[in-house]
């Protein structure tokens, strides 16, 4: 396994305007990461960039990564593959396919897209099982297109709907395409109140990319320490992002499970805490390297 980092880990500095995604590359290399992945590309922190602007930015990022001696290992975007109508679904599939072109321009071997964010469409509760056939059909169309560009696609346990290990496993088999796999985020299972080690043991065989993430867990009814940035799980417990090894996610065990399943690719730290990100990433990579050997 090789240590990598998500550009989202630098979001404190990107949001404040101190750096852009471009400058995150040199920072990641300086800290000691061997790979970096990018979330939705925003040239010069521009949120509404056109596809052509993103493609041009992707080329610049690829050259900068080459200069810094660091690999671009994945590209991550949001997506909703169940919009409630054929027309809306088709438009979203087209948009995601355009983002596959960005991944290819980056030189990223994998691209992660979300699949859904909500189980209520209009005034109707839909539910995951009812959405699954449509989501799988759309994800299959995307991965078939991505295969022509040499990019593997994957979905992550993310978004609180398609987040449990049994759901993402069912999604994997419903898509049923050799170019499609899972991005296994060991921390995100806690967002659905699932034990991370058990969840990872279920989905490890399907992993084509991995996020390493740690959270402090705060049970429902307990107050979070002052100054700690938290968010609610599906069952209304609280989580707070932290450096790898400072929380309650069994990171070392999850990595061991993945290794036993044959995973030997990049493992990307995705830091979501409130402490200064550079300090936490330096601490995190030292611990991660010790865990992966």
Feature annotation, model-predicted:
Residues 35-36, 136-248, 290:
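Acidic/histidine-rich catalytic cores of soluble enzymes
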Residues 16-28, 90-101, 192-200, 251-254:
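Short, acidic/polar
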Residues 8-10, 39-41, 77-80, 116-118, ...:
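Active-site beta-loop-alpha junctions enriched in small/polar residues
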Residues 2-4, 35, 71-76, 108-112, ...:
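Structural preference for beta-strand elements that scaffold enzyme active sites
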Residues 59-71, 82-182, 191, 202:
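Active-site acidic/histidine proton-transfer and metal-coordination neighborhood
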Residues 22-41, 107:
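Catalytic domains of carbohydrate-active enzymes, especially glycoside hydrolases
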Residues 5, 28, 36, 65, ...:
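Conserved, mostly hydrophobic/aromatic
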Residues 37-61, 116-121:
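Glycine-rich, proline-tolerant flexible connector loops at the mouths of alpha/beta enzymes
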């Amino acid at each position: 396994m090789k240590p990598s980092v998500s550009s989202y880990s630098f979001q404190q500095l990107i949001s404040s305007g101190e750096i852009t995604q471009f400058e995150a590359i040199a920072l990641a290399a300086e800290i000691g990461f061997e790979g970096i992945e990018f979330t939705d590309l925003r040239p010069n922190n521009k949120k509404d960039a056109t596809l052509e602007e993103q493609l041009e930015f992707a080329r610049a990022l690829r050259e900068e990564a080459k200069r810094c001696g660091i690999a671009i290992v994945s590209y991550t975007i949001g997506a909703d593959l169940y919009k409630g109508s054929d027309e809306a679904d088709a438009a979203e599939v087209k948009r995601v396919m355009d983002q596959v072109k960005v991944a290819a321009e980056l030189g990223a071997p994998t691209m992660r897209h979300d699949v859904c964010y909500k189980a209520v469409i209009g005034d109707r509760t839909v539910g995951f099982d009812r959405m699954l056939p449509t989501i799988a059909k759309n994800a299959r169309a995307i991965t078939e297109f991505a295969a022509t560009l040499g990019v593997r696609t994957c979905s992550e346990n993310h978004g609180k709907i398609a987040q449990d290990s049994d759901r993402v496993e069912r999604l994997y088999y419903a898509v049923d395409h050799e170019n499609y796999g899972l991005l296994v985020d060991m921390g995100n299972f806690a967002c659905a109140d699932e034990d991370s080690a058990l969840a990872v043991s279920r989905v490890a065989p399907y992993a084509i990319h991995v996020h390493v993430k740690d959270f402090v867990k705060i049970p429902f009814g307990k107050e979070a320490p002052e100054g700690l940035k938290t968010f609610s799980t599906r069952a209304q417990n609280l989580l707070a992002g932290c450096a790898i090894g400072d929380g309650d996610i069994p990171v070392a065990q999850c990595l061991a499970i993945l290794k036993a399943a044959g995973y030997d690719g990049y493992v990307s730290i995705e830091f979501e805490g409130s402490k200064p990100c550079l300090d936490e990433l330096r601490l995190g990579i030292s611990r991660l390297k010790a865990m992966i050997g």
